[in-house]
Amino acid sequence: MTTYAALLRGINVGGNRKLPMADLRALLDTLGHTGVRTHLQSGQAVFTTGRGDEESLAGELARAIEDRFGFPVDVLVRDHAYLAEVVRACPFPAAELAARQLHVTYFSAPVTPDRYAHLDQVALLPEEFRLGDRCLYLYAPDGLGRSRLAEALGRPRAAKDLVATSRNWNTVVKLAELTAPEA
């Protein structure tokens, strides 16, 4: 049995694509998963299962959400080992930064630096980003809402052919904790 986090993209934002967390928990239960929990209202669920892999579990959940709620949702599923490594490998001094300054964008596939070669990173300072394993770490000292770099990273050219969803550092750390094996 493996514990996973499901990351849903773009739900419950600005009153659009509403998906109550109680309904998401119930849906995961009906799919046969155990230990189902949600974190916040922005589309994080934790569950345990003994079947499937990250990609098949994400596809199953995305189809079930569309069937049940009538709208498509991009879903990424990641296990504890991956989530813990994202925390461990952070290239920025996470302990020194406010959670609103540090974000991780999770990707459905590996990303290479050439995808972002068109960005003038010097012009976007003091904001910075670094690539990780199927993720991108973003340091935005004034927060994500005011970040010119976040806007540039999210443009279609930069996100082409990928499912991508971002979380602030507090959520990144919490998901690693919630998926950890029980002692």
Feature names for model-found ranges:
Residues 2-183:
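Surface-exposed, charge/polar-rich loops and edge strands
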